[in-house]
Design a protein with these regions (language model features):
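Active-site Gly/Thr loop motif
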Residues: 8, 13-34, 38, 42, ...
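Beta-strand segments within the central parallel beta-sheet cores of soluble alpha/beta enzyme folds
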Residues: 12, 64-69
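A general structural signal marking secondary-structure boundaries and capping sites
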Residues: 57-58, 146
Length: 147
C-alpha cells in the first residue's frame, strides 16, 4: 500500500455500535475489518486509493503495480460463478445491478463495506455499513449524478 500513498499508521478501533451476530455469537466488526479470513484494515480514503489502482488498470502514476493479465483475469467471470472474478464481484448474472454497465466490479466486505469500480465514468465509490440490498441503488444514483 506504500506505493499508492496509503496511510501506514491506521489501526483498528471498533465502533461502540459495531456489533454483529454471527452464528449466535456477538462479534465486533469494523469497516474494512479482517475477522473472516480476509479483509483490509484501512480507512475510507485508503479504500478509495486501492479502488483507484484497479480503476487505472494496475497503474499508479507511471508505475505498473499489478499486471495487465491479472486485471484481465480478475474482471472475467470464473468458471463456477459468472458474477465472480479473482476476488472481485462482477456486475453480471444474479448479482447484476439493473441499469448499470456490466463492466462494473467491486469488493464487498462483511458489514456492508464496498469498493465499487465504475470504469465507464472513471469512478471509485466507497460505501461503509450499507445494507447490501441498497448498494446497487447507491451506485446507480452516483452514476446518474455523474452523467
Amino acid at each position: 500500500m506504500d506505493n499508492i500513498g496509503a496511510s501506514s499508521t491506521w489501526r483498528w478501533y471498533g465502533y461502540d455500535h459495531s456489533m454483529l451476530i454471527m452464528d449466535g455469537v456477538k462479534v465486533q466488526s469494523v469497516s474494512g475489518g479482517g475477522h473472516f479470513g480476509g479483509g483490509l484494515f484501512i480507512n475510507s480514503k485508503d479504500h478509495a486509493r486501492f479502488g483507484l489502482l484497479f480503476l487505472r488498470d494496475g497503474m499508479w502514476k507511471d508505475k505498473r503495480l499489478i499486471s495487465n493479465k491479472w486485471i484481465e483475469l480478475m474482471t472475467e467471470p470464473s468458471e463456477n460463478n459468472e458474477a465472480y472474478g479473482y476476488m472481485w464481484w462482477l456486475n453480471k448474472g444474479y448479482r447484476k445491478w439493473e441499469g448499470l454497465a456490466e463492466n462494473i466490479f467491486y469488493g464487498a466486505g462483511f458489514g456492508g463495506n464496498y469498493v465499487v469500480i465504475v470504469p465507464d465514468h472513471q469512478l471509485v465509490i466507497v460505501a461503509r455499513w450499507i445494507d447490501s440490498s441498497k448498494i446497487g441503488d447507491l451506485v446507480k444514483r452516483v452514476v446518474d449524478a455523474h452523467k
